[in-house]
């Protein structure tokens, strides 16, 4: 990878809390418009990696060096609204509308994610799939050049999962941005990713799925569980968000 195509670089990054090692000697380059999937067991440091990239925590050692300017769109693993806080969908999305997109581009996102009928709804009353679509829209409205999806399938019904898998596949062309996808879904990662990083407090292995599948480190962690198929049931509306 040449320097001109590099969007983000993590160089010899380690993170400790006291004597507890959460991440050690992480070296990652993410290129412009590249999609990178991150997998690993519970406690592997995936959430810590995301926090380091977002700048929420500072490495104990090493450097996280973004290109300038770096605009990150982030869809968190969990999102909760206090019951006493009234927050409409339109209010949440308005926070992301910073005039980086044209009105036509914003409307395209609303249509693609089937959001128009949700705008007056309270966030507290949305289903898991509806909440995920709103959070994805909020991230896209910031016109990111790096989109981070942290366990995007968590808590979704099967129909919404199928739609979101396909939408994620289309996002690089739609957005023209890099993506970092943290996922526990080994089957989707191994079948649908071009570059995978296997994390277990350090980088165990990385590369194309076919390369990881024969890696001894990968086999120790996951065996052949990724071969258990995700059943994709095509339906007429799979190109659009479930209503």
UniProtKB/Swiss-Prot annotation:
It is a peripheral membrane protein. SUPFAM superfamilies: P-loop containing nucleoside triphosphate hydrolases. The complex is composed of two ATP-binding proteins (ZnuC), two transmembrane proteins (ZnuB) and a solute-binding protein (ZnuA). It is an enzyme of class 7 (translocase). It is found in: Cell inner membrane. One of its GO terms (molecular function) is ATP hydrolysis activity. Its main location: membrane. Pfam families: ABC_tran. It catalyses: Zn(2+)(out) + ATP(in) + H2O(in) = Zn(2+)(in) + ADP(in) + phosphate(in) + H(+)(in). Keywords: ATP-binding, Cell inner membrane, Cell membrane, Ion transport, Membrane, Nucleotide-binding, Translocase, Transport, Zinc, Zinc transport. This is Zinc import ATP-binding protein ZnuC. Part of the ABC transporter complex ZnuABC involved in zinc import. Responsible for energy coupling to the transport system. Belongs to the ABC transporter superfamily. Zinc importer (TC 3.A.1.15.5) family. Residues 8-225 form the ABC transporter domain. The keyword Translocase applies. ATP binds at residues 40-47.
């Amino acid at each position: 990878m040449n320097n001109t195509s590099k969007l983000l670089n993590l160089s010899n990054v380690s993170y400790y809390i006291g004597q507890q090692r959460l991440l050690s000697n992480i070296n990652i380059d993410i290129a412009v418009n590249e999609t990178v999937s991150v997998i690993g067991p519970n406690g592997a440091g995936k959430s810590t990696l995301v926090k380091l990239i977002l700048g929420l925590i500072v490495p104990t050692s090493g450097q996280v060096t973004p290109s300038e300017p770096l605009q990150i769109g982030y869809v968190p693993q969990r999102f909760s609204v206090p019951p006493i806080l009234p927050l409409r969908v339109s209010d949440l999305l308005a926070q992301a509308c910073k005039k980086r997109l044209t009105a036509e581009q914003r409307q395209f996102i609303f249509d693609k994610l089937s959001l128009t009928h949700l705008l007056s709804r309270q966030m507290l009353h949305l289903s898991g799939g509806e909440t995920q679509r709103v959070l994805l829209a909020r991230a896209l409205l910031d016109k990111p050049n790096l989109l981070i999806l942290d366990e995007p399938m968590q808590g979704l019904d099967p129909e919404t999962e199928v739609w979101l898998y396909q939408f994620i596949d289309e996002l690089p062309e739609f957005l023209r941005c890099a993506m970092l996808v943290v996922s526990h879904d080994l089957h989707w990662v191994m079948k649908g990713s071009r570059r995978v990083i296997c994390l277990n407090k350090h980088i165990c292995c990385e590369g194309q799925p076919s390369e990881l599948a024969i890696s001894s480190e990968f086999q120790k962690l996951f065996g052949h569980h990724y071969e258990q198929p995700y059943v994709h049931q095509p339906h007429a509306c799979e190109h659009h968000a479930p209503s």
